[in-house]
Curated annotation (Swiss-Prot):
Tetramer of two alpha and two beta subunits. Residues 269-344 form the B5 domain. It is found in: Cytoplasm. Pfam families: B3_4, B5, tRNA_synthFbeta. Belongs to the phenylalanyl-tRNA synthetase beta subunit family. Type 2 subfamily. This is Phenylalanine--tRNA ligase beta subunit. Mg(2+) binds at D322, D328, E331, D332. Keywords: Aminoacyl-tRNA synthetase, ATP-binding, Cytoplasm, Ligase, Magnesium, Metal-binding, Nucleotide-binding, Protein biosynthesis. The lineage of its organism: Archaea, Methanobacteriati, Methanobacteriota, Archaeoglobi, Archaeoglobales. Its cofactor is Mg(2+). SUPFAM superfamilies: Class II aaRS and biotin synthetases, Putative DNA-binding domain. The keyword Protein biosynthesis applies. GO terms for molecular function: ATP binding; magnesium ion binding; phenylalanine-tRNA ligase activity; RNA binding. Its EC number is 6.1.1.20.
Amino acid sequence: MPVVTLYWDELERLVGADRDTILSRLPMLGCDIERVEDDHVDVEFFPNRPDLYSVEGVARALRGFLGIEKGLKSYSAVKGEWKITVEESVLAVRPRIVGCVVKGIRMTDEVIRSLMEVQEDLHWTIGRNRRKMAIGVHDLSKVYFPLRYKAVDANFSFVPLDFDREMTVAEILEEHPKGKAYAFILEGKDSYPMIVDSKDEVISFPPIINAEKTRVTEETTDLFIDVTGFDENVDRAIAILACMLADRGGRIESVEVVYPDHVELTPNLDVRFMEVDVDEVNSLLGLSLSAEEIKESLEKMRFSCEIEGEKLKVGIPPYRADIMHEWDVIEDVAIGYGYENITPEIPPTLTFGRTHPWNDIRSLAKEIMIGLGFTEVITFTLTNEAVMYEKMRRKGEPWKDYVPVMHPLTTEHTILRTSLLPKLLELLSYNKHHEMPQMVFEVGDVVVNSKNRLHLAACITHSRANFSEIRSYVQAVMRELDLTWEVRESDDEAFIDGRRAEIVVDGKAVGVFGEVHPEVLEGFELTMPVSAFEIDLSAFFDTGELL
């Protein structure tokens, strides 16, 4: 989780309260105070509140929480004469771009420091280390509109930030510090995203580095900000940055982004509205709050609220992209009301618990795998059909017995996983630039036919990963689990024919192992061989083997 450094002189001035008051109330917003020094405080915030990664965002929240300035703060973008044209060539590389212009900013050391820190924190969290989203900040006076967002080849050249000579894209990825750090994002690509202005001069090479010519200095008063990526994370980031700089007195102007098939006006600073039921609030929190008390709590959390009988019409500020459900609003009601004001109650009945057998086998499996030299990872339970089936060459039963997500917010999270292996391969693809060999495993739930199953999966990748190696690890796992097993031929298309096998216990297939098929490796953009196995641990409870 990101740790944000907040300097006392600036924080006290922006909030309008003394440090003792701030220190006593800050943890109530949902953060941990890591360190308190004479000139600053280090605060760790949860990843679900990226709007709090800057001193401006924290001050905004505290002013409401302390009752200094309650309710929804209005933000708007003036329609500007700024335009970005997105060319067809870049859509297959990094398809989304948004932008905004900020005028009238005094770029003091404090503002520059805050902007750089929030930029990197956003890169690390919602940007997934720039893979999903990357931000560029430029001196507007050096940018000549209209801009073009296009793809170029590796021989394209410009002067990157912190250099005084032209470098080709290939040279930047091999020699520039930022290029070497983030080259993995574009690995395997034969074209690269580039933002150029009307003079055909480069503004930015996202997600790697800006051009030297648009460097921001203390003399800068007007900014152009671009955010590139793949999904709605670019909209979240630009809204957070625009609101942050508006709080510094900046005038926000919109940028028109022209795609081949549609036009967008960014940033979108519109207020979203959500209906919240008073009874649902009290039922979930175990309280008996009136509509007026709920409204008071929400206004302290910087929402607007209108009472409409037993319903509340809640206005959500543009920087709160974490609010996706009625319960998210109710959580903020609890924070605004004050957890310290909620009286703990002893349950009316007393029961004694014990660990679930699944947790016992989960712990044992982890102990075995760590002892074999594997590194444990935890991947998302939500995934999509492309990762789970298409890239794995898997069709039909049982791989289609998945649970879909109703009204998914992104195309990446449309179903619950039915197998652990695809997510491990996806993880390896993100880490292929690291040293080999790589040995990873996961013990986790999958959902098949609407029922949870406990699986163990592992992958090995290096230049000589093979069937014999992965079989030796399967043998070790089954020996440590004290299970008698045998091997029979598998027809799992994710593995190479003749180098794949089923794990059979009491005549029932409980797992599979082998060398991953080259087409699967290509789908995940993996360049090294991979051998893998997956075992359904819950099958042993079905048969009584591990009870």
